[in-house]
C-alpha cells in the first residue's frame, strides 16, 4: 500500500455538473488557438456548437470523476470531513480527564480514591478538592461583587440623569452689551 506517494484528491459527487462545465471551459480555452471552421458546429464530429468539447469526452470525465472519488476517499489515510481532508497526524491527543489531579497534576490511579468536584473535576485528595472549592467561591464572590457594584452605579446614573454634580452653575443676571 503506497499511501505516502499518493497526493490527496477529492471531488464531491454533488459538484459533477460544475466540474463538467468548468472542464469544458478549460478545454475550449486550451484548444481556442486551433480554430477549425470545418469542425465547429458539425454534429458528426461530436463537437458541441457552443464550445469545442465533445459529448464523449464529457462522459469520460464523469466516469473518471467517480473513479477518483471512490479511490481516494476510501484508500486515503485521511478522513473526508464535509468535502475536506482531515489529517489525524496533527491531532493533539488530550489525556483522559481522570489521569491526573486537576490542581496539583499528580497522577491518579493505583487503587487510590479519586475525589470529584462539580461532576468532572478529579482531585487526588480532599485537601486539593477543598482548595479548588475555596478558589471557585472566591472567584464567584468577586464576580458577584463587581456585578452588584456595576448595577448600583447604573441605577444611580439612571435615577438622576438631568442633574449634573460636576459643574458649578452661577445663578444671577447676565448683562450683554
Swiss-Prot record:
Composition-biased stretches (Low complexity): 22-46
Protein localization: Nucleus; Cytoplasm
Pfam families linked: zf-FLZ (PF04570)
Gene Ontology CC terms, in alphabetical order: cytoplasm; nucleus
Gene induction: Down-regulated in response to mild as well as prolonged energy depletion. Up-regulated by glucose, sucrose and mannose.
ZnF (FLZ-type) ranges: 96-140
Keyword field: Cytoplasm, Metal-binding, Nucleus, Zinc, Zinc-finger
Region Disordered, annotated ranges: 22-49, 134-177
Record's compositionally biased regions (Basic and acidic residues): 134-143, 154-168
Organism domain of life: Eukaryota
InterPro entries in alphabetical order: FLZ1/2/3, Zf-FLZ_dom
Any single biological process term in GO: response to glucose
One annotated GO molecular function: zinc ion binding
Assembly information from the UniProt record: Interacts with KIN10 and KIN11 via its FLZ-type zinc finger domain. Interacts with KINB1, KINB2 and KINB3 via its N-terminal part. Interacts with DSP3 and BBX21 via its FLZ-type zinc finger domain. Forms heterodimer with FLZ7 and FLZ15 in vitro.
Described purpose of this protein according to its UniProt entry: May act as an adapter to facilitate the interaction of SnRK1 complex with effector proteins, conferring tissue- and stimulus-type specific differences in the SnRK1 regulation pathway.
Record family assignment: Belongs to the FLZ family.
Name of the protein described by the UniProt record: FCS-Like Zinc finger 1
Amino acid at each position: 500500500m503506497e499511501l505516502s506517494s499518493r497526493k490527496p484528491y477529492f471531488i464531491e459527487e454533488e459538484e459533477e455538473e460544475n466540474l463538467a462545465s468548468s472542464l469544458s471551459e478549460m478545454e475550449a480555452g486550451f484548444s481556442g488557438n486551433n480554430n477549425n471552421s470545418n469542425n465547429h458546429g458539425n454534429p458528426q464530429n461530436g463537437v458541441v456548437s457552443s464550445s469545442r468539447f465533445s459529448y464523449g469526452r464529457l462522459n469520460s470525465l464523469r466516469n473518471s470523476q467517480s473513479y477518483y472519488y471512490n479511490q481516494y476517499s476510501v484508500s486515503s489515510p485521511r478522513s473526508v470531513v464535509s468535502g475536506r481532508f482531515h489529517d489525524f497526524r496533527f491531532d493533539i491527543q488530550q489525556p483522559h480527564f481522570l489521569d491526573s489531579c486537576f490542581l496539583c497534576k499528580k497522577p491518579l490511579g493505583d487503587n487510590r480514591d479519586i475525589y470529584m468536584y462539580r461532576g468532572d473535576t478529579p482531585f487526588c485528595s480532599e485537601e486539593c478538592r477543598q482548595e479548588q472549592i475555596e478558589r471557585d467561591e472566591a472567584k464567584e464572590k468577586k464576580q458577584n461583587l463587581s456585578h452588584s457594584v456595576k448595577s448600583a452605579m447604573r441605577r444611580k446614573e439612571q435615577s438622576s440623569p438631568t442633574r449634573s454634580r460636576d459643574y458649578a452653575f452661577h445663578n444671577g443676571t447676565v448683562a450683554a452689551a
